[in-house]
């Protein structure tokens, strides 16, 4: 794979202006969430979903590397 570059693109939302309404909204969500209910498993569900979503991308990179 000499001479080939692999580029990964990530989309990260960036806020340029934080208004008073935005700050208030963040406080409300923290207060509403409170303590995590349901234990350890609900915290793992988003991580498992992200891993499942990443599998096709990882597999395609592995296949491409194996072909070259």
Curated annotation (Swiss-Prot):
Give site residues, Cleavage: 21-22, 39-40
**Which ranges of residues are annotated as propeptide in this record?**
1-21, 40-68
The keyword DNA-binding belongs to this UniProt entry's keyword annotation: yes
A GO MF annotation of the entry reads: DNA binding
Q: Note the superkingdom of the native organism.
A: Viruses
> Which Pfam family, just one, is annotated for this protein?
Adeno_PX
Query: Chief subcellular site?
Result: virion
Compartments in which it is found: Virion
- For the keyword Cell membrane, the answer is no
What GO CC terms are in its UniProt record?
A: viral nucleocapsid
Keywords, A to Z, come to: DNA-binding, Late protein, Virion
Family recorded in the similarity comment = Belongs to the adenoviridae pX family.
Function, in words: The role of the precursor might be to condense the viral prochromatin for encapsidation by virtue of the two basic domains.
What is the protein named?
Answer: Late L2 mu core protein
Question: Which source organism does the UniProt entry give?
Answer: Canine adenovirus serotype 1 (strain CLL)
């Amino acid at each position: 794979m000499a001479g080939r570059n692999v580029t990964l693109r990530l989309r990260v939302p960036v806020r340029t202006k934080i208004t008073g309404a935005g700050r208030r909204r963040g406080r409300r969500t923290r207060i509403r969430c409170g303590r995590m209910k349901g234990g350890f498993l609900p915290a793992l569900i988003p991580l498992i979903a992200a891993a499942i979503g990443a599998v096709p991308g990882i597999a395609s990179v592995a296949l491409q590397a194996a072909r070259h």
